[in-house]
Amino acid sequence: MSLCVVGAKTLVLATSAFTLSWTHSVQKTLWEEHWRIEQGGLRIVEASVEGSGAGMEPGEGARFDGRFWRWKPDVPPLPELLLRRSDAVPKGWTLCAAGKCRAIADRAETADVVAARPCRDGK
């Protein structure tokens, strides 16, 4: 499977898993989500947040590891993730896959919304 990141340009990543992270605009703490690409869409396998507050409450069953609250969300696969730009978070989203991290804003250029979805025929 591959992941397509679609904005002003399309980026195709040959990977079966990826991590999406960002810094919360108010709390200034890190949020990470680990995703797997499946036939049915994108499945979140773990979420973690560095601290809590202002809309960043850890999920059900979360455990604190000394730095992060970690949990496994119980939700069905999603067909795509829509990632919006925010002036409150200048660095935006970071996507890591196959040992390399990329700032989504670097790929999106002028796109306000970037979609991440399983590739179908390279698109």
At which residue positions do the language-model features occur?
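Mature, soluble, non-transmembrane domains
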Residues: 58-123
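N-terminal secretory signal peptides
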Residues: 4-58
